């Protein structure tokens, strides 16, 4: 299995403040995690980085967003699972941006 890290920015809730709850982002993370586990992968870590101001506004669905909820997920899976995760994130209207980074081919590459 290969180690990956997923970074994602989701739109803030309609009444978002800097301390808003990350439930929208965590629901998306659960959907991605379920896809990983269904394909015999392992989710190592899910981290919420909170609501942050974006470097430049992101336009999506005829709206402009200056803030976004940032989160990341570290996981082991087969390379074919990436396409399923990308499909989930592409179809989710709350996702502003995402990126999947390959961290290591095997455990010995990390040491």
Swiss-Prot record:
The keyword Transcription regulation does not apply. GO terms for cellular component: mitochondrial small ribosomal subunit; mitochondrion. One of its GO terms (biological process) is mitochondrial translation. Its main location: mitochondrion. NCBIfam families: S6 (TIGR00166). CDD domains: bS6_mito (cd15465). Keywords: Mitochondrion, Ribonucleoprotein, Ribosomal protein. Component of the mitochondrial ribosome (mitoribosome), a dedicated translation machinery responsible for the synthesis of mitochondrial genome-encoded proteins, including at least some of the essential transmembrane subunits of the mitochondrial respiratory chain. The mitoribosomes are attached to the mitochondrial inner membrane and translation products are cotranslationally integrated into the membrane. This is Small ribosomal subunit protein bS6m. It is found in: Mitochondrion. Component of the mitochondrial small ribosomal subunit (mt-SSU). Mature yeast 74S mitochondrial ribosomes consist of a small (37S) and a large (54S) subunit. The 37S small subunit contains a 15S ribosomal RNA (15S mt-rRNA) and at least 32 different proteins. The 54S large subunit contains a 21S rRNA (21S mt-rRNA) and at least 45 different proteins. One of its GO terms (molecular function) is small ribosomal subunit rRNA binding. Belongs to the bacterial ribosomal protein bS6 family. The keyword Cytoplasm does not apply. Transmembrane segments: none annotated. Pfam families: Ribosomal_S6 (PF01250).
